[in-house]
């Protein structure tokens, strides 16, 4: 795909697609709950479709009329052994969270995925589930897909300290704990996104959260609910950055989810001096309207507890930093190496090919700001990573002459099927 965008500034209002994390979980909770769950504004990206198809294969009736999705849950014990292996596509969330559910079911299921997902570590989720009584066998000693899970109807509660800051691993243990005998205790070293905990309560479940300690009693029964999915702040992040770095821009993003475990990017924008307004806050829905306009930015440091609250936004934050005055340092983000790609290396390579000055490190990047971007000599390949594709497309807005050849642009379908339509709407051309 060729990108040649001569933007005179981005203008307009936009409603970004539904939050990917909440979309996954709404299908999962609806499938293990008893009764009907109705979901509004779900993200119909490839990852969420993988979750839907997996639960259909487990015997759950899921209807989509194009407006709302209806999940006819019969309770977790009614899930059935799949007739064939479950295709997880490129979705780490689908794989890891579903593993927690399968761990407590008395049958065997095999999960497989695409080349990218098959390289990602699954031992981090296999270890606690094995401690609880599930049998899990992966492709290697490190446990990678394809992975076979033989669940147990007699899971035992455990006390578990998460070795990595991962909402996916935490959520897998919570889903397994719902089926276990006794009280499961999960301790986080760094707080990660809290959608699973909050949605468990919404579906009538019991959970106690005290700072970084989570207690989940076993043997729980959940009830179907009506869910409205807010806009995804990870998708909104691309427009927030575009509005800040493209001259003469002013954007309003409506109904964006602002769960406090996901708003690290807003704090970074404010720390860098970006003109950002948070309007029309809905405390119950945890959503707001966000308004940005082109700004003079300065470098900052991003590290520590902030990292889990913006881990998925770091690629586009790196682009933001290239346009800020001074140096931006990102550290404590080694988790980027095991995302859809090694995002430390891939982000640095892509932006450096356009004239940026980024030094990759073991756990982040050092970015010298104030750089003018140009079209690269060679094509940039997303390597199947949706966030890399969107980062490059936003970077193209800053290139005055020439065009960018973006290979495997279809990866963007993972989380934002209407991305290029929205880009055309806001920029006036593509």
Swiss-Prot record:
TM annotation in the entry: none
Active site as annotated: 312
Gene Ontology CC terms, in alphabetical order: cytoplasm
Pathway named in the protein's UniProt entry: Metabolic intermediate biosynthesis; chorismate biosynthesis; chorismate from D-erythrose 4-phosphate and phosphoenolpyruvate: step 6/7
Keywords: Amino-acid biosynthesis, Aromatic amino acid biosynthesis, Cytoplasm, Transferase
Enzyme Commission numbers on file: 2.5.1.19
Reactions mediated catalytically: 3-phosphoshikimate + phosphoenolpyruvate = 5-O-(1-carboxyvinyl)-3-phosphoshikimate + phosphate
Name of the protein described by the UniProt record: 3-phosphoshikimate 1-carboxyvinyltransferase
